[in-house]
A protein has these predicted regions:
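S-adenosylmethionine/decaboxylated-SAM
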Residues: 43-44, 48-218
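N-terminal auxiliary segments of SAM/dcSAM-dependent transferases
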Residues: 1-27, 32, 37
Length: 218
């Protein structure tokens, strides 16, 4: 999750944001309420252009079955669910009752509560309990860095051919480039190499927000 793109030259992020469809009043209200209720946590939300991109992608795919790992206060899940087919279902994985209580309130306001299934608990356990087979259209991973490879390995086999996996914060604010990365940065670096070597997908790492990997199941 990230607010803006710190990897671009000064002024470029503002220009990109200014030339992308802006969030509506509900998403603006959610962002503001998140900042009020959880000071210092605002960076955990995706950027507005990332939300627009994800909603567009879900719509272009006609996604009906999706999963999100890491929901926070619900901004990204609203973007995904809005783009999905009207009969679609989004499964959201998170461990925080406090954060997701705000998400639930805004899902209700957005008219999406019936299309989003929140599952509280360790995400790896939730993913392992999902049906087997290739049935997922879309997945978004935006959670603890140490768990990225584990989440990936549970999700990839469940993706249908042509399904898309999005992974956020793959640049980790530039920390992955440090000569002696800390444990979190090292986990992201190792995940990036793991995903790149996975012959079940083709992928591109995009300079959206704090780095977004887009992988298509072959």
């Amino acid at each position: 999750m990230s607010d803006g793109n710190e990897h671009l030259a000064p002024g470029v992020d503002d220009y990109l944001t200014g030339h992308s469809t802006p969030p509506d009043a509900l998403l603006r209200d959610l962002k503001a309420e998140t900042a009020r209720r959880f000071p210092g946590r605002g960076r955990m939300q995706i950027s507005q252009e990332q939300g627009t991109f994800m909603s567009m992608l879900a719509g272009l795919m006609g996604a009906r079955h999706a999963v999100e790992v890491g929901t926070f206060t619900g901004y990204s899940s609203i973007c995904l669910a809005r783009g999905m087919a009207t009969d679609g279902k989004l499964i959201c994985c998170d461990i925080s009752q406090e954060w997701t209580s705000l998400a639930r309130a805004y899902w209700q306001k957005a008219g999406l509560a019936g299309r989003i299934d929140l599952r509280l608990g360790p995400a790896l356990d939730t993913l392992r309990a999902l049906p087997g087979g290739a049935w997922l259209d879309l997945a978004f991973i935006d959670a603890d860095r140490a768990g990225l490879t584990g989440y990936w390995e549970e999700i990839v086999p469940r993706m249908r051919p042509g399904g898309v996996i999005l992974v956020d914060n793959v640049l980790l604010h530039g920390r992955i480039f440090e000569p002696e990365p800390d444990a979190e940065a090292l986990a992201v670096r190792q995940f990036n190499e793991h995903a790149l070597a996975d012959d079940r997908v083709v992928l591109a790492m995009l300079p959206i927000a704090d780095g977004l990997t887009v992988a298509r199941r072959t």
